[in-house]
Amino acid sequence: MRILVVDDFASMRKIIKGLLKQIGFQNIEEADDGSTALEKLKIGEFDLVICDWNMPEVPGIEVLKAVRNDPRLKDLPFLMVTAEAKKDNVMEAVKAGVNQYIVKPFTAETLKKKIEKIFDEG
């Protein structure tokens, strides 16, 4: 499985990558902002996107909307990561087509459960 991790903080990308490796995923790419993520998604084949909500210029919700509006990417599993579990944000993400939502900080076990839930539903 090829996973794209999108976060503007290198330390957070490193943490998520480390957690993914703990639960058995090795094929992980990174993007440091929403624009880079969209470029990588257009040229690459990914099985899952794990994307931070709060990023400058192109926030995670805009990445999600762009993915859902792209005929080639519209069914790509998408896990939104955020530091805040505001109900309005969760509802906006659900409306935009997010598969799962995870609040920082989280453990490898929580991440594993969210990923399993995405693929069990698919």
Located regions from the model:
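Short amphipathic alpha-helix used as the core "switch/output" element in two-component signaling
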Residues: 39, 61-74
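Active-site beta3 strand of CheY-like receiver
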Residues: 44-50
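Alpha4 helix (beta4-alpha4-beta5 surface) of REC/receiver domains from two-component response regulators
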Residues: 17, 62, 85-100
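Two-component/phosphorelay signaling modules centered on CheY-like receiver
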Residues: 10-29
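C-terminal output helix
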Residues: 106-115
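Receiver (REC) domain active-site loop signature in two-component systems and cognate sites
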Residues: 55
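Helix N-cap/capping motif at the beta->alpha junctions
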Residues: 30-39, 60
